Amino acid sequence: MAKQSMKAREVKRVKLADKFFAKRAELKTIISDVNASDEDRWDAVLKLQTLPRDSSPSRQRNRCRQTGRPHAFLRKFGLSRIKVREAAMRGEIPGLRKASW
């Protein structure tokens, strides 16, 4: 089980990313615009750097909903491999069963 503080930190990162999404997108379009002046582009770079680090979506980490485990996360289920296996063995995931060939 992950610490509660780690789970809370992830929630905070998601909220910050949502809050600053539009502003980051606007600044990135200015930076990538070849028709914009160098001064405008440089100002946009500086403004982008002043935004909180945790507002960047690349700092988010997928975590298991039940345990908070950051590794072996399966996006389809939103769970770690361990919890997916446990749920599958109990028959809680429709259509999922242990492979046999």
Curated annotation (Swiss-Prot):
Molecular-function GO terms, alphabetical: rRNA binding; structural constituent of ribosome
Keyword Metal-binding: no
One of the GO BP terms on file: translation
Superkingdom of source: Bacteria
Keyword terms of this UniProt record: Ribonucleoprotein, Ribosomal protein, RNA-binding, rRNA-binding
Pfam families: Ribosomal_S14
Gene Ontology cellular-component annotations: cytoplasm; small ribosomal subunit
UniProt keyword annotation of rRNA-binding present: yes
InterPro entries in the cross-refs: Ribosomal_uS14 (IPR001209), Ribosomal_uS14_bac/plastid (IPR023036), Ribosomal_uS14_CS (IPR018271)
Subunit structure as annotated in this protein's UniProt entry: Part of the 30S ribosomal subunit. Contacts proteins S3 and S10.
UniProt record similarity statement: Belongs to the universal ribosomal protein uS14 family.
Physiological role: Binds 16S rRNA, required for the assembly of 30S particles and may also be responsible for determining the conformation of the 16S rRNA at the A site.
Identification of the protein by name: Small ribosomal subunit protein uS14
